[in-house]
């Protein structure tokens, strides 16, 4: 499967951003500071 060259950096930036956002919301919800 050949992905477009724009798709690779997009996933490389979006996936960590979603992971960090979900982790941040998880910490905020559980008040683990």
Curated annotation (Swiss-Prot):
Keywords: Chloroplast, Membrane, Photosynthesis, Photosystem I, Plastid, Thylakoid, Transmembrane, Transmembrane helix. It is a single-pass membrane protein. InterPro entries: PSI_PsaI, PSI_PsaI_sf. GO terms for cellular component: chloroplast thylakoid membrane; photosystem I. Pfam families: PSI_8. Its main location: plastid. The chain crosses the membrane at residues 6-26. It is found in: Plastid, Chloroplast thylakoid membrane. The keyword Glycosyltransferase does not apply. One of its GO terms (biological process) is photosynthesis. HAMAP family: PSI_PsaI. Belongs to the PsaI family. May help in the organization of the PsaL subunit. This is Photosystem I reaction center subunit VIII. It comes from Spinacia oleracea (Spinach).
